């Protein structure tokens, strides 16, 4: 559309594709390479599979949610399944942490401030007859406002630490705002 009316627009039109937009790194490389030098204005768009083909959705302000990525590493003490009293099983702690994280959206966020917390990957254990000494939870938080985003980050860290402590484990949280 813009190309068809280029003679009516003063200045130069640049069409760009931002690589690595999901992790918010592509724009930095593009700026470092000078792609945006001399640009006076910009209109950005994002492909959204939920929007029917041929339709465009325009709104003032932010349109897509901010994306954060978290990784929780839970540490207990591994050992043989025949000797559970000598171990600190990280797997039940992982399960409890996942359940406790569900309260972030249902009980801690203002219901008119959309926020999604997703646990997308869990790993624990190395063998069928060994109590797991470590577990990992990986997920994402999507938010539309900074207050909810801040609250979610604080909650993920607090829940991970407190739940781990209640299971005699420790939790290390890596939380990246992408």
PLM segments and residue spans:
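Metal-dependent amide/peptide-bond hydrolase catalytic core
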Residues: 92-178
